[in-house]
Every structure is written in C-alpha cells, then in structure tokens.
Amino acid sequence: MIATPAILFGIETEYGIARDGVEDLDVVAESIALVRSAMEPGVRMRWDYEAENPHHDDRGWDVPELRQDFDEANYFEQDTHRELTFAEIKSDLALGNGARFYNDHAHPEYCTPECSTLAELVAHDRAGERVVMACAQRLSQARGATVRLYKNNTDFRGHSYGCHENYLLPRALPWDRLTAGVQAFLVTRQIFACAGKFAIEAEDKFVSPHFQIAQRSDFFSELQSVDTMQKRPLINTRDEPHADPRQWRRFHVIIGDANLSPFATRLKVGTTALVLEAILRDPKRAFPQLADPLAALPADRKSTRLNS
C-alpha cells in the first residue's frame, strides 16, 4: 500500500465557439476576445510557463517532437501576423476562485482549481459554465451578434477538442502498475460516463450520421503517448505535475467527454478516483485486462444496448 492523502482532481474544458452570421470565423481571434472579456478588477493576465514541458514523458524520457508540433508551427506562423504579443494571444487569466481561463489554440479553455471532493469539483465546473457564458454575453453585445459556446467535444467535421481530467498521484506508484490497473476501466467507462453524439467521425472528416454513446472515442488510436492533439492515446503520458516532481505525478486523462449533467461529472471523476485509490492501496493486485483495448473502444461507443 502506498500512503497518500485524498486524491486531488480537476477538469479542463475546451469550448467550441461560433458567431451567428459568420461562416468563416477567425476562431482564434474570437477565442482571445472572449477570454479577455473576463478582464475585471481582481483578474490578472499572467501564467508561469517555466515548469511546463509537453515533451516530457511519464515513462522516463523526453520525446524529440510531438505529432502536433507541425500544427503548433502553423499556429505560430499565423500568430506572427496578429498585432498581439504571445501573452496577449494566450490571454492566460488566473481567476479569483483559483481557476485558469485562457485561449488554447482556437478554443476558450476553463480549468477548475484543484478539488478534494466531488461536490467542490461540480460547483467549480458549473461556475466555469457561468463564467464563459457571461463572457459570451459581453462579447455578443460588443459584436452586435450572438456568440455561441458549445460544451461538447467535436465540430462534426472530424476535429475534436478536449475535456481533460487531472488526478494528483504519488510518484512512488510505478507507472506500469498505474496503467495496468486503469486501462480496462478507462475503456469501459465510456459506456456510462460520456455525453454521446449523432455522428461517426475520423480525423478531419465526417463519416456517417449514426448515434454513439461517446464523443471522443473516434479520435483515439494509440495505447500510450505523450500527444494530445493527433493520434491520441488511451493513456496520456505527459509528465507535468504542477507540483514537486520528486513526489507527485499528474495523471492526465484525455479520453472523457464534456458533461452538462453534474451527476455525470460526479460519476466520471468519482469512479476514476475510486479505481486510482484501489491501485494505490494494492499496486500488485491483478486488475482486469482487455485483450485489445483500442479495438474495444468502437465496440462499446457504438452500442446502444450496452451488451458489447
């Protein structure tokens, strides 16, 4: 058994954004404007990126490049034509309630503070909804047209954006024991903790109009990887604990859907925390395994009878 305090957790939600009457919207500019509309007394535009290294892998090495580095280079090239500094483009805000609100590529992203109870987490997630909606209303007035936000995970054209969960775990827990214990759970969790959509998609394309119970599963093709934007993995290995790296790791879960229902959020995060606690209590325990976790994803997400 690995001694540990209660598991801390949090949620990062990227919102889809659109404006009525504008087909070819500059979503980056719109996202920047929306986030900056949250500027008011007590809100500061600052963030320390020094400890962030998206190339650092939980398995013990640094990858030379990410699959999304090409996209990042394109974003950087586009951003050089904006009359804004890097800090102004990111518009990283630390809110008074401990949340982080910023422009992540082409999406406004709201990150809850670290929470120790499900009630606290749900309250912060709902507070995030109110913050982004208040910003949308302000921006709509400024634009003279309705700015719409979508708490979902796809544009139905083969592009997905995330609702990520974070769980603070002791570094003493071996990575291979963590992944062996949680792998089958993350696949089967899709059955009861996702939001669903009426579409089947692939990278950069819409495939067919059929219902499935998960929004994100169409976009996962790897078992483990440090990437988050292309060839997404079932288990993300990015090692950015935002804490003392000698003691802690941040288990970054990227396969979940954004939930509107507080009950669904409780179920998603609560069951995950229980599984993680079970792993911490007995890391050597033999947890259930799937012969082919990636093959199981399309089976469970497209079942409407829960019998796959």
Give, region by region, the residue ranges found by the protein language model.
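Short coil/turn motifs at secondary-structure junctions
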Residues: 20, 170-172
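Short, solvent-exposed loop/turn segments at secondary-structure junctions
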Residues: 115-117, 154-156, 172, 218-219, ...
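Extended, Lys/Arg-enriched charged tracts that mediate electrostatic binding to polyanionic substrates
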Residues: 206-222
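A short alpha->loop->secondary-structure connector
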Residues: 174-176
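Histidine-centered divalent-metal-coordination microenvironment in nucleic-acid enzymes
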Residues: 153-170
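The feature captures the catalytic groove of carbohydrate-active enzymes
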Residues: 164, 171, 220-223, 252-254
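Terminal catalytic/cofactor-binding subdomain
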Residues: 1-150, 180-199, 207, 225-235, ...
